[in-house]
Amino acid sequence: MTKLPEDTVTEVASGIKAGSRTGSACLLVISGVAIGRSFKLSKPETIVGRGDDADILIDDAAISRHHAKLKVTSNKAFVVEDLDSKNGTFFKGQRVQQILLHDGDRFQVGSSTILKLTYQDNIEEEFQRQLYESATRDGLTGLFNKKFLLDRLAAEFAYCARHKVSLSLCMFDIDHFKQINDRWGHVAGDAVLAQLSRLVDKASRTEDIICRYGGEEFAVLLRDIDEKNATCYAERIRRRIEESQFALTDKDGSPQSITLTISGGIATVGAARFATMDDFIAAADKHLYQAKRAGRNRVSSGIGD
């Protein structure tokens, strides 16, 4: 984690022109949980924060709901202003209240998110979007990938451990998925994975981090959710999948419909203490395999242990 300097400096915009760059002004995230994302600066004022009403929403617990504001000056330069955030806005290692930005300048919000002012044309914007998607999303299901989850989990785990708030991790695995692949083929198996992903996504909150963890295993990170409510969430997902029909095409090209079940394991920071993030993941994985050994199509957590 980046150490936050204590001193604060202030610099007021002095009318320096934005320069001769063409294209749209954008903020590119070059460090932090949203790394790789690009946000177009198309309004006179743009709020950066983790609140739902922020213009640039960065879902990082170390960032305030309304953390900083970018303003366009009369000569089309950009000024970033801190909005009395808890963890501060930094420029070149110093905490700032207000600073003028030039093309290529970087500033930091919170403990680890670094943003860079740049100018992009439409082709560059699309390239940046595709680059971010390919780096963070699973190509088959459209869910976040394992690397993205681990990056987010590292930040969330540290925050929850410091502030004594709940964080739950649900691990799901499709029961007997190999039999689906063996009987119907891998194309059918992929169709099942994609449909199941959509079901889980629709049954989850906007702020929940859902990822394909590997193969037929999925993980959901639930911020500020205790063990009891995480177990209720996992049971709701399990029942919804058990009651659903999954459409697929068999090896001969004929349409088919099947049912399936999942098993789930839950670990919660707050209900138990974990020395490391790896211990936290291992606990959820342990409960997942307890559910498997107990007969599958069930959820296991620390409740009742």
What does each model-identified segment do?
Residues 35-111:
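Forkhead-associated
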Residues 231, 255, 267-305:
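Catalytic-core segments of nucleotide cyclases and related cyclic-nucleotide turnover enzymes
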Residues 1-59:
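Intrinsically disordered, low-complexity acidic Ser/Thr-rich regulatory segments
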Residues 131-151, 172-185, 194:
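Conserved nucleotide-binding and Mg2+-coordinating catalytic segments in signaling enzymes
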Residues 209-212:
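A short pre-motif secondary-structure segment
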Residues 146-165, 197-205:
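Short regulatory alpha-helical coupling segments
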Residues 141, 170-173, 215, 284:
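Conserved metal-coordinating catalytic motifs of nucleotidyl cyclase and c-di-GMP turnover enzymes
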Residues 197-198, 229-250, 283-285:
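Alpha-helical scaffold within the catalytic cores of cyclic-nucleotide enzymes
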